[in-house]
Amino acid sequence: MSINQLTCHETLVSSSHRVFSADLNEHNTVFGGRILSLVDDTSSIAASRAIHQVQVTATMDHMAFIAPFVMQDAMLIESYVTGTSHRSLEVFVKGLGEHLLTGEQFVGFTCFVTFVTVANPANPPLPKIMPETDEEKFLCSGYADRLVQRKADRNYQKGLFKHLDLN
């Protein structure tokens, strides 16, 4: 695709991890903070593949922990860009699991991560994202609605910050 548009696949990052005891919490499932760290890591690479500019993590939205990861599981984390606007881009992340002793596969989590370019305005302008698969088309079709919701959430946060007690 051209520099002004990319497919979701051109931004795809896949990362595999075996669950070890150091990853586990007191419930013997992978600690949520460990998952969030992996999410931020892989999604930032997808964002960089799309824009080749310095960007920062702005939000993690709709983090849904669907099924836990335990010892003898593998995690496959897939991240790809699902939308861009003036200075921001959205990355969808899904965590797929595999029980290594049985081969059974499952969805462990999903979320969206928003990144914002440091440059204002973004230079060069952010590319348009072109979905190809059914999954990508479904996710990209909801980008505009999620963008509107993020703006509403940001306005709410501004009001909340004014009322936070720092003592």
Where are these regions (language model features)?
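Hydrophobic pocket-lining residues within nucleotide cofactor-binding pockets
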Residues: 24, 60, 117-118
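Hydrophobic beta-strand-centered segment that forms part of the acyl-chain substrate-binding groove
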Residues: 2, 10, 30, 44-78, ...
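Buried hydrophobic packing segments
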Residues: 35, 39, 43-47
